[in-house]
Amino acid sequence: MKMDWLKGLMRLRAGTIIAASAGVCLAVCLLALLGVFIVQSASTMTARAVSGIEPDWQVQVVGTTDAESADVAIHSTVKTKSLYKVDYADVSSLSSTIDGTTQTTGVGKAVGLDEGYANNNPRQFRLLSGSLDGVLLAQQTASNLHARPGDTVTIARLGQAAIDVKVDGIIEVSNADQFFQIIASTPQTALNAPPDNIIFLPAPQWEAAFASQLDSMPQTSQRQLHVSFDHSVLPGDPTQAFVTATEMANSLAAKLAGGGVTANNLAARLDGVRQDSLFSKVLFLFLGTPGAIVAILLTMLIVLSGSDRRKRDIALLQMRGASRSEILSMSGIEALLVGAIGAVTGVALAAVLAPIFVSSAMNTAEYYWFAAAGLSGIFASLVVFLIPSWLALRNTALENTVQPRTLAYLAPTWQIFGIDILLLALAWFIFWQVSSTGYQVVAAPEGVATATVDYKAYAAPAFLWAGSALLLMRLFSLFMRHGRNVLEQVLHPIAAVFSKTVSASLSRESGRVTKGVVMVALAMSFAVSTAIFNTTYENQAKVDATLTNGADVTITGTTANPASPLLDTILKTVGVANAEPMQHRYAYVGNDLQDLYGINPSTISAATSMSNAYFGNNDAAATLTSLKNSPDGVLVSDETVGDFQLKEGGVINLRLQFASDHAYHIVPFKFVGIAREFPTAPKDSFLIVNAAYVAAKTGLPGSEIVLIKSSVEPPTLAASLHDITKNMPGLVISDISEAVHRLGSSLVAVDLHSLTALELAFALPLAAGAVGLVFALGLAERRRSFAILQAIGATPRQLGAFLWSEALIVYVAGTAAGLAIGWLLAWMLTKLMTQVFDPPPDVMVIPWSYIAILCLTGLIAVCIAVLFQLRKTSVSLSTAMRTI
């Protein structure tokens, strides 16, 4: 019997089975590919995180343990790529005498480096002038001492006579906060600020000068081993990689037996990334799951479109004595057939498409996702088929045969209890609760950050989507039942004299028409929200990279070797759209040394983005105008305002270094506003001023940095500019593609480009399918009505009035509602992610071209459905009557 039933399904309902299987196929394929993106993004985040770690471990030798014993323990624990000894010693001061003037710093650090450390760690040590071999001065220390390569610096040792050393190079220590972190047996909540005055010595020279201090005053000196090892042993998932990195450090601790303390830089980075990895999973699922839900709903619509026929089938089986379990098993056969076909084709399609959207090979975790997606498709198919059958079995055979007539509208249970209003209220409550606290990003000095996300925030958009759909169903059903006069006026241009008849017919079919409108709205909202959010996300990721790098291409020099003399040559270079000089100096606010950036407020935005979020009043134009109108104006950070109790319009005295004597002198400025972010600036505190005013006061007209806006690919332009700067010592060129995000890096570094392409590619057929299929299935249910109209003499034009009128209602209402819901969803998700972005977006980016294509695709789909139905109405009257 079951085999006969299966053969009958294949013979008589092949079209329905294929259509339903196609819906399951789309859902399975989308879920499987989402799994691929989740796994790939996690691996990418892990790879990016560990690639920037130098070193992985900083092992501080303590007690009686010597460096050689610790070296043996390290090599037995990990496969090392490099291991260098680094010694630290406190010094009373550094001083130099240049041109008859002596400059003396405060306390500082003298660091001993093994041979090759500086040369082999370009991310840690950036050469500005001279050579990396020999004695090196940190950039700010060199500036304070007015020292250049070849000059002599005096080191005042603790409890010993001062010594003189000859400077060989000036460097920038890129990750000084990590390099000089305090290593303790208990984890530190934040890294300490690095010392202001730093000098690096070759290891033998440091040993000769400070070995006795290391033995006699261990509290003022330390010995560390900086270790980098092979990362291939780390799993791709950040959480598992974090566990592995922690276990390796624990193994080393056991071998050292108290003889060393490890700063696990690798685990610290992965600890933050694992939070972001979970965020990306939620984000990907949130962006893609609605598409799978729409595909399943379309499958459900296909199944329910034949509900009357299925009830008659069940009635026939009931009259022939089939039991409930037998009837359900037959429905289950159909469900399994549809689910199996959809699951197999969906997984196969995902396997074909995966190499197009992701570059790396498939792994075990992705195959698990494929299996889970296939099983989910089969489960969804069982639910879609078995629930209607189970409900039908609650009726008698007669009740399943006779179409019930409802004289009065009966509100569904969800409307009576206001589930739509409840969902919307929950959405806005969660949104208010989360957005009021936001995503709290805890930043260490100089922008080392770990991001944590309140994942319940994603319940808000989910509730909004479901609640909006139900509210639309409530309101549109109400309109269709009670707005007949308005409907008649709306349809008059199409139906003409038949508008009253058509509106009355549609009003009687309000339930079916409303479901069609809601389905179209859901499909459209998925496409629109995905397009808007992903476009905004990608645009903001570029803004974040610009904030880090400064511009598309940035040339960075020093006060002694500024980049600004090359400005005219840069502007003539092919591919340069614009270029702006920017000073980067240092200024004392009280005793606090801060970065100072001198700009031309009128033209800075021509070379780099000036986001509203950069400034305290959220108005970039107004803030820059205020700075322009106040030549002595200064923008300060929130931290500085609080620390020094500043009032807008008040005077703030800064100490700047003058060219005349290389000493710091007081220069008065007027506080005109707050800067929260600025291109290339650190996160904690900095100053923005007029470059012309600083140049006039200090006698130093040059600008250390040139920001360049590119009209070609930034890496291409950067390569061209290398020819210009190759003979200029200390100038470094960086382009936006090299930018490493210092705040929230893993979050906005997640590349949504391929995921966007996938989702938008799926959204088009889903939207077209929703519009065309909903309308076509609705007309199929009305075959009897059209046959009767033909029987009583209705002309093709009159039948066309019914068809085009319903098409207008379903398409226009569904599309308009979908656009509104989609925009609202994208707005909410963007707002919820405001503090994840650095800086947050000023406005959402609307992909108008895609939305136009989306609407046009839906229009074409509904036109095809109408024309197909009109063709079917041209059959003979006898053929039409056989459909009654």
Question: What is each of the regions a protein language model found here?
Answer:
Residues 12-41, 277-315, 336-345, 416-430, ...:
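Hydrophobic alpha-helical transmembrane segments of multi-pass inner-membrane transport and secretion
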Residues 1-295, 305, 351, 360, ...:
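Membrane transport/envelope proteins' first extracytoplasmic loop
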Residues 53-66, 437-626, 635-638, 751:
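Juxtamembrane segments of multi-pass membrane proteins
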Residues 280-283, 331, 335-340, 358-387, ...:
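Conserved transmembrane alpha-helices of multi-pass membrane proteins
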Residues 2-3, 7, 18, 325-329, ...:
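Alpha-helical membrane-protein architecture signal
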Residues 393-412, 872-884:
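Short cytosolic juxtamembrane segments of multi-pass membrane proteins
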Residues 39, 342, 346, 350-358, ...:
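Juxtamembrane/transmembrane-helix interface segments of polytopic membrane transporters
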